[in-house]
């Protein structure tokens, strides 16, 4: 049942976006050189090994902002790094208290290996604020997908011969669908991506919590999920209070859009080479999700990194409480050994 944690985490983080994304982005103070804080956020990759460029792309809501790192000697392949669910920024941190720097570290290590990497704040997250905040409750997964496809086209327009989409968690599904919408995409990488559709995950998870003791509540859940699956919004006024919070009107458009996609089918439809990566200690999206995706794309490479948590970090902890203080809360932890090698071997074969 551990794999079913993914669904509830997705809904809770979507709700958090709606509460926090309209607030001005907070800029953390710059640590003093030589301080402990500065040491904690310093990459082991020397900045002289690459050039860092700001990116701003006009979209229908405003601008997408990101950071492009390019090797000093240049690169033929560019990787677009797509963040996971919740208000997670381009570096892999968010206001829920997650501080991992995992995307920044991955971008810098891949750039040191010879690949350009663009990481960005998704729509309504970080610096990519909405010009019209009233549109926030209408946020959908399809908008994220179109944004990723537009950034892939942007990278191709910048002269990179190959563009690869690397999506983490929810970003893996975004990558699979965006690859179908942009002819620039030459490959996709699923990093701890779910292998099951969100409605299936939610049904199984909530059944495990509610059946048989609360059958009447589970029947209510089934009715709500079935309506959302049909694309119908649900008036939660007369539903149980706990379900009102989980399926509130502000998150329903996003859930409905997410339910249109089965990660296995979308990976199968993406007609580009694929790498599927999972973590041996991932408590949010355990390794059986890798097998589910691999069964849909038997030509894809797959790799389960021993000891890797959902944040792509090396972590010996196998409890959620233990990981919250380490993999999710300690930016000094390194990326899991073997992760960068698995990615660069895939990129080198394209």
Residue ranges and their predicted role:
Residues 136-157:
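Alpha/beta-hydrolase active-site loop
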Residues 73-74, 79-110:
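Short, surface-exposed "cap/lid" segments of acyl-processing enzymes
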Residues 189-264:
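Accessory cap/linker subdomain of secreted extracellular hydrolases
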Residues 270, 276-278:
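Short beta-strand/loop motif that positions the catalytic acidic residue
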